[in-house]
């Protein structure tokens, strides 16, 4: 997958923060080499977070996020500040842009404390260096720049690159479960909710990971699954299905063949599968009047039969036999207070970076609200979670302990 096609969730997210008129947007435009944000002498020109996916050398694929000033005022200003601070949830590296002619302000000091509290690596870019004297020595994560004079911008980018955490061993979606020449069957329903002319991102990424493992990927609809399996001389190593077809696919795939879902694979990839497994047990305890939050990390046009807003609520009501209520969020929106919910059911999070997914998990756990995901919940409600977790022995044991406990 080329840099230009790198999914947003796999890119380093760099957030630029600061007070109004510190020259934050001007610095962003210099760093990106294009007019990403409108600049003006009028305070509060940036009214909403603006983000752009691009390649930023020497880092590579990134998402640059320019945020409103954190000192905005009035009712509208307070909302802008809230949105700016929400960006921290997905920020891998923070850049605080200051006006070097006035020194660090109390609000900027508070922001630095937030970076430290959330363990976000940060850089301080003292802008307007052409209007003040530059100290001979400074901390290694600070630099004086001038957006107006295009000064020290390359050095700022190098400083940001050094703030990137050392690359961890590459995580794999499914390749670590496979050997070269293994056959994997992917079951992809084509219904009214499926996008025209393409596969969705989780399916694309899974196919790519299978190919990189030297394995063989076969893609079929559930309606052709039986014929696909019969055409093979040997049973496939693994069958991966869209979660909504779990019930049908479970009946068609021989019990000696391992079966899981795209959603479960992505939960493991994002590091939240264990919590999702434990959260699924809450489905057994839902009561009349409980509210379940169903949250998706992307936005798409809702159609009849949508899995999040129609199928999941119907399955949950049928499984529990209770009058359960539902709330829905999509994209960047996630409630600041989830304590009113009995359960959060989240999508696989393919469009979210790891930091944002971990924030949502931690946010729910701190309020003692269980969280599970689409694939785990659907498999549990269809009575096949035990089978769906068989490819992951340690996690399978965690579910067995929960189910029998």
What are these regions (language model features)?
Residues 1-78, 86-89:
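Conserved G1/Walker A P-loop phosphate-binding module
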Residues 67, 98-101, 122-136, 143-151, ...:
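G-domain G4 guanine-recognition motif of GTPases
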